[in-house]
Amino acid sequence: MGRRKKEPRSVHRENIVSAASASFMEKGISATSMDDIAKAAGYSKATLYVYFENKEEIVGILALNSMKKLYDYISSALIQHETTKARYDFICRGLVQYQEEFPFYFKMVLDKINIDFESKEYLPEERETYKIGEEINEKIKNFLLSGMEKGDLRNDLDIMPAIFNFWGMLSGIIQLAANKEEYIKKSMGLSKIKFLEYGFSLVYHSIAIKEKSL
């Protein structure tokens, strides 16, 4: 314990968040108690409350971390290529890589987030998570508008509904491929990669102008 007291507060918080993430992955958020997190992190429950007010605060930090990572993946995908199809392909690849490296975070990104900041009953992390989420939506919006201006994507797309459907379809395909990989291989004779490529192609064809869809 003497060693811990000399460590910065941020180190303790990171240790606890990391342990909580592992516990949430194993048991689920609702089934994980502060006692479970304390035990996994190697802290007493009393010490845990020195660094976090409650479990919701820990969940809020994890949600923020997940959104930051997603932002990085999307940003990286969009700056690597100029053509609409290539940028789309890299978005898909980035999302697959994100899910494979951070499966728990991938699921968290799809969860409900707080959007009511009129009252004072919200965590600072919740506002920042919302802000980053809006920045991601803006990037996807610009991607769609750019594709429409180039004549690659349909010009009748209603942008905001298109963005949410875009996320829903891509994330659903990726999560399904992760959960049902063995079934897909056995019943369809497709590898996970081939199944994903087919699904991503269907989504792209749904928003692309037919003459220019690949």
Where are these regions (language model features)?
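C-terminal peripheral helix-coil segments that are non-catalytic and often amphipathic
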Residues: 97, 138, 142-150, 164, ...
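Short secondary-structure transition hinges
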Residues: 100-139, 161
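Short hydrophobic/aromatic patch on the recognition helix
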Residues: 20, 41-52
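Hydrophobic alpha-helical connector segments
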Residues: 65, 76-104, 159-166
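Short, basic, alpha-helical segments at the C-terminal edge of helix-turn-helix-like DNA-binding modules
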Residues: 64-71
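Short coil/turn motifs that cap or connect alpha-helices
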Residues: 30, 44, 53-55, 83, ...
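Basic, helix-initiating cap at the start of DNA-binding domains
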Residues: 1-27, 31-40, 57-60
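Base-recognition residues in the alpha-helical recognition helix of bacterial helix-turn-helix
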Residues: 25, 49-53, 65
